Amino acid sequence: MPRFVSKILNQHKLPMRTLTLSLASFCRLFLAVILIPYLTVQTQAADRPNILWLSCEDISPHLGCYGYPNATTPHLDDFATQGTLYTHAFVTAGVCAPCRSAVITGMYQTTLGTHHMRCKASLPDHIKPFPMFLREAGYYCTNNSKTDYQFTAPKDTWDASSGKAHWKHRKDNQPFFSVFNFTGCHESGIANENKWKTVTKGLQLHDRDTVASSLPPYYPNTPLTREDWGRYYDVITAMDRWFGEHLQALDDAGLADDTIVIFWSDHGVGLPRAKRWLYDSGMRVPLILRIPKKYRRGQQGLPGIKTDQLISLIDLGPTTLNIAGITPPAYMQGRPFLGANLPAPRQFVFGARDRMDERYDIIRAVRTKRFKYIRNYEPFKTFYQYMNTPEKGATMQEIRRVAAEGTLPPAAMLFMSPTKAKEELYDTQADPHELNNLCNHPDYAEELKNMREAHLAWVTRTRDIGLIPESEIAEGEEAFGSAWEILNGGNAGNLNERLRDAASLSLAGHDALPAMIKTLSDDHAAVRFWGAIGIGNIKKEGIEAIPQLHSLMQNDASDAVRTAAARALIRMGQPQEALDVLAQILNDGTQWARLRAAIVLDETDRTALPVLETMKQNKTYRQGMVADGKYTVRVLNRALNELLGTHEVVP
């Protein structure tokens, strides 16, 4: 008997009587024992779908297949006839990084502490980016190439993540999950003329007056806004060309029938009152997918179908795992909408806005198929806070210019208000641009109540860490290892509920003053913070709290609480000591404490003049801070320009 045959028999513990088999029988046995396991592996690999994500940035569903005939999107329009188009898909934030954090983890950014734009959070040990589960199951996972997750992803998240990452580098017959991101339609592709020209090179550009027919009513209709809107359509066409190239590559490789393709955008239009906001202009996105016939379950993925099923992009990760035959981990807050063993369809989707670059504004949103509810936790902040990035764009500049002339259209004037409503409710079927707030309409009182309750239940269930000041989150991360631990760890107690109630109380007015004063003695800084904010909101009606506010401002261990107390005293007409405290925090505080102090000084306008020199001295970059502390520099630059009548520009 040949030696290799003996070795095979020994390795597989075959009985010695095998030696008496005929050569033909032996060959059959050889195939059964040796080859079939390998063939089974290959068959299992072939049975699992490849999954291709083609994502883009900063676009709402302004595509031909979504009913915009002036959009030039032939590849996506054709793709929609081959797959399923979702009319009610939404993001969890109106800006890229917090949304991408939710997508890659299947968890809300407000649970993880990745909610502030441009932060550096840490994940708790048990939470992993979902591609790691695919890799463990044998998938080849690539990302080309944007990450922007708000945390440093583990090294084994991807097999490859770079501008060269591609599914074609996988092993033979290995299933793949590949992501390609088109960045050309980012807001910078509209605002930056050179980028716009590069992205749209070789394309026939849209007629500006024609596409202006879809210009939203909250923009002034001027040549410059029409130009921005036309550029927006142009970069969408460039993206459509890119999309078609990726589908063609899949066809050329003979993989179209083996690959589920999902197209989505990371948030809405990259223009004011859309990007960064929780209106549909910022939250509603295109979502189209194509499922080869052999991978369809029931009615899932039938070609040419439009569905109004509510989808949140937090569901993409769990869905991708589910269609790959992997049970999503229990900690994920997203839910699968394709594959086997699906949960009940969503009744609500949720969104959050927190710090956008250099400006804080805590806003939450709840959406059903018809209604949108918005809770403004800081309604005394002006609607259009000054932020460097959007202010560089022509549309924002036109809004400012036309507002100064007093000729803004009524819809645009709504968003020049120095304050916001505490709550907003919109019937998106009758009012798709969300201009008519129904909160005070008696016919919608029950709907308002239901949506408000859904919001508070979500805040509680998901443990919304966005209600904690960022400087306090930073301290908690250092103490516990991750922001998640602050409200989910063993020491949290009922902090989650106390925080929710204190934040809600801050908007309750003078009648809630005794309860707000009580929160000033809470043992957690975040609760004290909201008590001071609430008292400041009612200005001189909270005068009986002045002694407690003075004590907090001078003695509290938390700079966030001291800043909130100083703000309250300034709003009550007692700025002297308050300005000194804000100046001291500006000099010596941590980066996020300094930013909050700078914002309060900016919001006090000319009241801040006594600390003008301190503001000038602190308009400097500091190493060791996120982006060298540029956000504080931006706020101080804006404040100084207003106080001095200057026009200095900072990056």
In which residue ranges do the predicted regions lie?
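N-terminal secretory signal peptides that target proteins for export/translocation
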Residues: M1-S25
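Formylglycine-dependent sulfatase
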Residues: F26, V41-S417, P432-E453
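Long, internal low-complexity/basic segments
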Residues: R3, K7, H12, A45-P49, ...
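Bacterial N-terminal signal peptides
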Residues: F26-Y38
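Short, basic, low-complexity termini and linkers enriched in Ser/Thr/Gly/Pro
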Residues: I8, Y38-L39
